[in-house]
């Protein structure tokens, strides 16, 4: 998955001169999607799942936000993408039924999230694992608890929810991978 912000050299220089962050500059649009290769990784093409313009962001009082995404293949050709949306309190979702070539209109899920990047993983037996901080608060201080949710029905519901830590810390960008039957978390 990728997320893209068209930053110009001028915007970067402006940020450096002012001693501020590049995301303090307004951008014309922001997008999230996946990169597909048909030649073994020699070249890639972007497939956009979500794109919003500066005008749309202004409706919410934003000049910038982070639609960071994660993707899992639920069934052959059916991909589900979840992404965070600053200030919305819920993860957004988009689905593709053609291996990521095209994507459906994003919609809000019922999964709480305080604008923290989630991660989807698929187990060898087909279950979907979500690593998330399910809190609908805002800001870094809302990035807890850290939980694993497991779906046995392609994300139609979550059969098991495991609290890894409910300490009110800041669990940002939790990550993991599956090797064999073992789930590794960082």
Region locations from a protein language model:
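Asp-box/BNR beta-propeller blade signature and adjacent active/binding-site loops
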Residues: 1-186
């Amino acid at each position: 998955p990728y997320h893209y912000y068209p930053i110009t050299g001028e915007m970067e220089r402006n940020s450096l001169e002012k001693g501020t962050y590049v995301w303090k500059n307004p951008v014309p649009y922001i997008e999230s999607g996946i990169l597909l290769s048909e030649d073994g990784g020699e070249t890639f093409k972007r497939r956009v799942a979500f794109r919003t313009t500066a005008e749309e962001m202004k409706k919410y009082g934003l000049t910038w936000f982070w639609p960071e995404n994660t993707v899992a293949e639920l069934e052959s050709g059916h991909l589900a993408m979840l992404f965070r949306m600053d200030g919305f309190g819920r993860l957004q979702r988009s689905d593709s039924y053609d291996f990521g070539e095209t994507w459906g209109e994003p919609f809000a899920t019922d999964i709480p999230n305080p604008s923290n990047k989630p991660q989807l993983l698929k187990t060898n037996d087909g279950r979907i694992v979500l690593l998330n901080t399910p809190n609908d608060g805002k800001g870094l201080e809302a990035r807890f608890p850290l939980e694993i949710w497991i779906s046995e029905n392609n994300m139609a519901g979550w059969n098991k929810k495991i609290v890894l830590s409910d300490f009110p810390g800041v669990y940002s960008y939790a990550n993991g991978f599956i090797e064999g039957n073992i789930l590794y978390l960082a």
